[in-house]
Amino acid sequence: YGWDVAVIPNRSQDLIREIDLIEEIARLIGYDRFDLNLPNPIKPGKLSSEQLALRRVKNGFTENGFNEVLSYSLVPEDKETLIKISNPLLLETSCLRNNIWKEHLEIVNRNIKAGQTSCYIFEIGNVFYRTTEIIQEELLNGAIFGNRKFGEWVNSGKDNDLNYYQARGKLKEALSCLNIKIDDKPTDSIDFLHPGRTAKLIIEGKDAGYFGEIHPKLIFEKKSLKKVYLFSINVAILLGASTRKNKWIPIYKQYPVVPKMERDINFVFSRKFLISDIISQIRKTGKNLLEDVYLIDVFEDIKLGDDYISYTFRLSYRDKDKTLHDSDITSIHSNIITKVEKSFNTKLRN
């Protein structure tokens, strides 16, 4: 329109991009002066594959007993290297957060003080940090506390809290709607998590986040806190793995018409070995008739030693054409036991 635009000096900090100036002009001249013509042609709107996957994630968590929370992305300045905003209204909201777990821990702590016996929460939000430039990263964060199976029931004076494997299973169930594989890699590099009960979450070979129990020092600092598990997953990596074009191609298998045969095996392993590696070895050895293998029990005791732990696996055998007998699986089952003993320097427990 041939206008001359002058920016008032005390407003110039709000005007950085071209679109900021366009919005300012629109506000000043009045939105009623814009044409009401709709774009032509009008196309029907639809959700993208990423948006659909994100909805599945939220539904998966709520269906598994989690509550979605929204925490404030503006935080007060502290000793950490936070990104300051140029025009804060309050000192308490003068910086952009670089994590979400602290607020989630406060939410859990408030619930514990209020007498709640469990608290399962999740949030999809942004964090901000600076490398050579300002980075905005979208994360799926959450916290797990307490065992909803028991509620307020007193279990003969025993601790009703979830153990590490049960809590990790809760996260696995919530994300099962995406039908992706998430591997766990033990780590002790996250300072606010327990060094022996923390794992990096690996998706398609990428470091996507973490899952772990809070560090004992946090429980000591906040007297009311108890055993809490925190998790964080990069949303871009999560959605990227779940929206591959070949991910949702249906594959149909014939329903089995013959029964399966199950056998349990129990070994004492050094803690340095990963369960995923053990299961992979079992699958590889028994691939002809072995249909499935999964962990059913974990046992820790001082008699085993501090560096050792007992795992029990359930193996399912099935032949698609006939009912199996003991003699059909004896050789394969024995071979699996021998291979596990040799590969992981262990012995079968009676």
Feature-to-residue mapping (PLM):
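Short, glycine-/Ser/Thr-/acidic-enriched flexible segments
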Residues: 3, 9-13, 74-76, 90-91, ...
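Long hydrophobic segments that form regular secondary structure
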Residues: 1-5, 112-115, 121, 127-132, ...
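Conserved alpha/beta core surface patches that mediate binding of polyanionic ligands
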Residues: 20, 68-69, 98-145, 216, ...
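A carboxyl-terminal module marker
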Residues: 154-350
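A glycine-rich, aromatic-flanked flexible loop/lid motif
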Residues: 25-33, 75-77, 132-147, 241-258, ...
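Charged/polar, low-hydrophobicity segments characteristic of intrinsically disordered regions
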Residues: 57, 133-142, 175, 344-350
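Extended, well-folded interaction surfaces typified by the phenylalanyl-tRNA synthetase beta subunit core
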Residues: 1-122, 129, 316-318, 328, ...
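Short, hydrophobic beta-strand segments
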Residues: 2-12, 36-49, 83-90, 136-158, ...
